[in-house]
Amino acid sequence: MGSPVQLSLLCVVLASLLLPGKGVFINRERANNVLARTRRANSFFEEFKKGNLERECMEEICSYEEVREIFEDDEKTKEYWTKYKDGDQCESSPCQNQGACRDGIGGYTCTCSEGFEGKNCELFVRKLCRLDNGDCDQFCREEQNSVVCSCASGYFLGNDGKSCISTAPFPCGKITTGRRKRSVALNTSDSELDLEDALLDEDFLSPTENPIELLNLNETQPERSSDDLVRIVGGRECKDGECPWQALLINEDNEGFCGGTILNEFYILTAAHCLHQARRFKVRVGDRNTEKEEGNEMVHEVDVVIKHNKFQRDTYDYDIAVLRLKTPITFRMNVAPACLPQKDWAESTLMTQKTGIVSGFGRTHEKGRQSNILKMLEVPYVDRNTCKLSTSFSITQNMFCAGYEAKLEDACQGDSGGPHVTRFKNTYYVTGIVSWGEGCARKGKYGIYTKVTTFLKWIDRSMKARVGPTAETPRTAGPPN
């Protein structure tokens, strides 16, 4: 309650306003002056007091700068200011399906939970392949606005229509453990192929003949320097069972000169240019140390050499070949195939991953000696335009680039023909063949790889062209009609 003195003064003021000749009402300005509220702190000491939200913005009208001085944090200032100026737009909880609401001046923004979209997260997003691979374990494709899952060779689709299951002890694309059971052969497709059709797209050679004499169709064309043959610089040793699809091509002196990828128990994928580097060669699998026997190594003779007949020795275009072995590989520790993917799925899903993995026994640096230890290296995919600008050589549609611009890690001489695989949900798929590069781990230069997705049909036809380990002596195919 006010004191008697204060009440008396108020009565005097009000009485003076009602002097004779004056109206009952007064203008707003005079009334506000009479009822004006005195500030709690005087103007001088106000500047020295720490900002107080109640004093500055509730008892008085505050400015944005005053709010910022109170919170001393830009984000908290903006959050409070938007509510202070026009109220909390999120108060009515406009975001549906557990969406998070963020208030704004004159509006709000919803951050939707996975599977929902729209201004208020009111729209359900169909789980197509672009969203978490449609929940498929392996291959995903879209049909009539729905997802269809499928599996790599050697797997079958589970009852849920999503998972891929294999009963084989060593299915493709899985790192191996200590299991030593024999696996079944993997089929790449259920469809049949006419042998003559297959022969139109590749060259067939017998390794008992001289590959140099049979393959020198482009002998007069200029070749890249041997220093440009890709080729692991950097990286680390492949742990036990970690690179089971690695194959090694060995010459008559039992020396490794190129790599390869195990596709199934009879077939090895490699680079076409490797076929020019030895008169006769065999394939060794299960090797992690060429100077030490570990019990999993096996050597296989080659029955048929299938080289793409469009291979260009001057550009390394179509640098791909398939080797058929005389005897089947027994899958075991450190010996298992990598999976062949589906083309569209591989290009939209696998090759949009950040990295792939290369492995081999190549040189440990550009002028160094061959490694006796199997090494692996994770390499990032490189944007196509970036790669093309990094070299004066042609980067065709049958190639892709991977590696580091400046980091001293790369594939190198001796790794040629070896695997480039990409991991997806703990399964490894063949995505490339080590092909060529300018030196090893040079700054601004990348490794160039044969793009396997371009040749998946060719690989499938090549593996179907012979049906048993005792195929008759192959012949060299003519050019495509």
From Swiss-Prot:
Signal peptide location: 1-20
Catalyzed chemical reaction(s): Selective cleavage of Arg-|-Thr and then Arg-|-Ile bonds in prothrombin to form thrombin
Enzyme class: hydrolase
Record flagged with keyword Secreted: yes
Tissues where this protein is expressed: Plasma; synthesized in the liver.
Domain Gla: 41-85
Key words of the record: Blood coagulation, Calcium, Cleavage on pair of basic residues, Disulfide bond, EGF-like domain, Gamma-carboxyglutamic acid, Glycoprotein, Hemostasis, Hydrolase, Hydroxylation, Protease, Repeat, Secreted, Serine protease, Signal, Zymogen
Peptidase S1 domain location: 232-464
Cell location: Secreted
Modified residues (4-carboxyglutamate): 46-47, 54, 56, 59-60, 65-66, 69, 72, 75, 79
Domain EGF-like: 86-122, 125-165
Control of this protein's activity: Inhibited by SERPINA5.
Record PTM text: The vitamin K-dependent, enzymatic carboxylation of some glutamate residues allows the modified protein to bind calcium.
Top-level taxonomic group: Eukaryota
Positions bearing carbohydrate: 187, 218
Quaternary organization: The two chains are formed from a single-chain precursor by the excision of two Arg residues and are held together by 1 or more disulfide bonds. Forms a heterodimer with SERPINA5. Interacts (activated) with guianensin, an anticoagulant protein from Simulium guianense saliva. Interacts (activated) with simukunin, an anticoagulant protein from Simulium vittatum saliva.
Record-given protein name: Coagulation factor X
Species in which this protein is naturally found: Mus musculus
Gene name in the database record: F10
